[in-house]
Design a protein with these regions (language model features):
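Structural/interface elements that position substrates and couple domains in central-metabolism enzymes
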Residues: 1-206
Length: 206
């Protein structure tokens, strides 16, 4: 019931953004959700936080015009944030409560402050809160997943090389180079597969 949104001060949008043929993400469900909720919250200050993965500049070019058109308000009279999650399949609950970081792309400081306080009530570790503008957050989300994909592929490449060389041990090589603080040990194991709803499509989009 979209009308219940008027009872809240913040709305988090977690809807699917399917990949299109060109690699970009389709925001049709996201835009539809905004058009359904906005009429019920346009009379007061409200924070709209998008969790779904989007193509960079989506909030500026597609979402912001919808908010302004339906509410008749400009930025500052509402808060718009990009607040993507970084979760792994099979480890979702733990990733929510013990994240490596919280990323907040904010339209204004007020919205960012409120969103930060909400997260502090949820997570149970001392994860850093990275606050930036919206476009940098949009880029960072897919860049992070693309980098992890690249690292997995590199680990598998090490495995292929070690299989072709007598005495080669992929685990030993990964342990050695992973000791370097510039590289790290995570996702370097040979034979690691990648999949799920994020890595493949985010790599293509990037």
């Amino acid at each position: 019931d979209f009308a219940r949104a008027k009872e809240t001060a913040e709305t988090f949008f977690i809807v699917q953004t399917p990949s299109m043929a060109d690699g970009n993400f389709d925001n049709k469900y996201l835009k539809s959700a905004f058009e359904s909720i906005l009429p019920h919250v346009k009379d007061k200050y409200h924070i709209f936080s998008i969790v779904s993965t989007v193509t960079p500049s989506s909030l500026e070019n597609e979402i912001l015009p919808i908010i302004k058109r339906i509410t008749g308000k400009d930025t500052g009279n509402f808060g718009l944030c990009y607040n993507p999650s970084f979760i792994a399949l099979g480890d979702v609950i733990r990733n929510i409560f013990y994240p490596d970081m919280i990323l907040i792309g904010e339209s204004d400081t007020k919205a960012g402050n409120i969103l930060e306080e909400i997260h502090k009530k949820v997570y149970k570790n001392n994860a850093p809160i990275m606050r930036t503008n919206i476009i940098n957050a949009e880029i960072a989300k897919i860049a992070l997943n693309a980098y992890i994909t690249m690292k997995i592929n590199f680990g598998n490449l090490i495995g292929e090389i070690c299989e072709k060389v007598k005495g080669g041990n992929a685990d030993e090589v990964a342990r050695i180079i992973g000791t370097d603080s510039r590289i790290g040990r995570k996702y370097l194991s040979a034979g690691t597969a990648y999949g799920g709803p994020c890595f493949p499509r985010d790599a293509i989009a990037f």
